[in-house]
């Protein structure tokens, strides 16, 4: 984040003009920007693949995001990177129509204040994430 403080970064996600966060990544190790959005209580539209599923799916196995469908295929030969991206690696290729549908659904949920949606539940889920990351949980391991 360069020279930005945690508070400055958080303020970007909480800016009044920001209604949601979208990531159509092929794959993420952890997905820090996605996590920061969840932690900040804004709805997320994302490819349902890779590391971000560790926190985008709650402890009961329910998705807490607008899940964009994808096709899982090998990476393109031109992006092979020795020691990082091997030719056998697989990437999620988001489906365009699914992305459009999930963006529209998120937009409609946000603008209608749909409390029964991922958008309507984003602040509550952020609270759960905060609780899971409190100092006691860090000291003693995950609470299940």
Language-model-derived ranges and their functions:
Residues 17-19, 41:
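A short alpha->beta transition loop at the rim of the catalytic pocket in nucleotide-sugar-dependent
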Residues 90-101, 105-143:
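A charged, aromatic-enriched C-terminal amphipathic alpha-helix characteristic of glycosyltransferases
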Residues 47-48, 68-70, 74-76:
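Conserved acidic donor-binding loop of glycosyltransferase catalytic domains
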Residues 31-34:
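Short glycine/serine-rich donor-binding loops of glycosyltransferases
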Residues 1-16, 50:
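Conserved active-site histidine-acidic residue motif and adjacent donor-binding/catalytic loop
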Residues 43-46, 56-57, 63-67:
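Short hydrophobic beta-strand element within catalytic cores of glycosyltransferases
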Residues 26:
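Aromatic "clamp/platform" in nucleotide-sugar-dependent glycosyltransferases that forms part
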Residues 37:
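Donor-sugar nucleotide-binding helix/loop cap in glycosyltransferases
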């Amino acid at each position: 984040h360069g020279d930005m403080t945690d508070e400055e970064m958080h303020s970007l996600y909480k800016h009044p003009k920001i209604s949601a966060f979208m990531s159509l990544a092929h794959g993420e190790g952890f997905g820090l920007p996605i996590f920061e959005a969840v932690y900040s209580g804004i709805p997320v539209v994302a490819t349902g693949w890779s590391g971000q599923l560790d926190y985008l799916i709650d402890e009961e196995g329910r998705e807490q995001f607008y899940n964009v469908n994808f096709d899982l295929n090998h990476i393109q030969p031109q992006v092979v990177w020795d020691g990082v991206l091997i030719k056998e690696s697989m990437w999620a290729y988001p489906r365009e129509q699914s992305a459009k549908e999930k963006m529209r659904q998120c937009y409609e949920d946000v603008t209608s204040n749909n409390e029964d949606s991922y958008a309507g539940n984003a602040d509550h889920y952020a609270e759960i994430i905060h609780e899971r990351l409190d100092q006691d949980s860090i000291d003693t391991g995950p609470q299940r």
